[in-house]
Amino acid sequence: MSLFPSLPLLLLSMVAASYSETVTCEDAQKTCPAVIACSSPGINGFPGKDGRDGTKGEKGEPGQGLRGLQGPPGKLGPPGNPGPSGSPGPKGQKGDPGKSPDGDSSLAASERKALQTEMARIKKWLTFSLGKQVGNKFFLTNGEIMTFEKVKALCVKFQASVATPRNAAENGAIRNLIKEEAFLGITDEKTEGQFVDLTGNRLTYTNWNEGEPNNAGSDEDCVLLLKNGQWNDVPCSTSHLAVCEFPI
């Protein structure tokens, strides 16, 4: 049997195999549907080389790292404003009455009584030697002669006021106390002719001498108690006996 008659057929098979690698199955069917049939897909090749780095992406959110150690305490800050007062608490229960030794109580009462007795004796001595008492007033003089302003200062120093009779009994007590003319706590310095006491109250009792007050020297703003018990207006700058009154 000769090989030559099959040679054309072998060449045709090689050409068909080579052509099938360069065309798709669909194209081959279109060109030669009756001669060549499509073969199965070939084996995958090796992976290609890595491509170039892409563009830099946007910054991501910070990740949750490990919690660090607790730091040292900071400096003490300034004190805050005081808060509002709290509501009052409930009322407590009534306590038991206190007890004091009977000896201390009786001793205090005894000392108080002795002191009161001594004060009463001193008051009598003062009344007998230097002063006069009428009702709840005690009139006292130190025998000094001075201006009206100094008399006021002297009486205030001893928590008293310049003697101011409110009735005939007080006026007579002051008259019996003095041996010479004395200032009274009465003036018309603010309003001429309107005599008031040192607190600004108008007088409810007067005992002016005949023809007084007359403001003879145009500056007679103070009042004297004369030896006869009557009153006379005089300048406050003159000097006369100081008499103070003490409430008791």
UniProtKB/Swiss-Prot annotation:
Residues with PTM 4-hydroxyproline: P47, P73, P79, P82, P88
Disulfide bridge map: C155-C244, C222-C236
Presence of the UniProt keyword Protease in the record: no
Keywords: Calcium, Coiled coil, Collagen, Complement activation lectin pathway, Complement pathway, Disulfide bond, Hydroxylation, Immunity, Innate immunity, Lectin, Mannose-binding, Repeat, Secreted, Signal
Molecular function GO labels: calcium-dependent protein binding; D-mannose binding; identical protein binding; signaling receptor binding
Region entry Disordered, spans: 43-113
Coiled coil ranges: 112-130
Post-translational modification summary for this protein: Hydroxylation on proline residues within the sequence motif, GXPG, is most likely to be 4-hydroxy as this fits the requirement for 4-hydroxylation in vertebrates.
Biased composition (Basic and acidic residues): 49-61, 93-102
Domain notes from UniProt: The coiled-coil domain mediates trimerization.
Protein name: Mannose-binding protein C
Species in which this protein is naturally found: Gorilla gorilla gorilla
Gene: MBL2
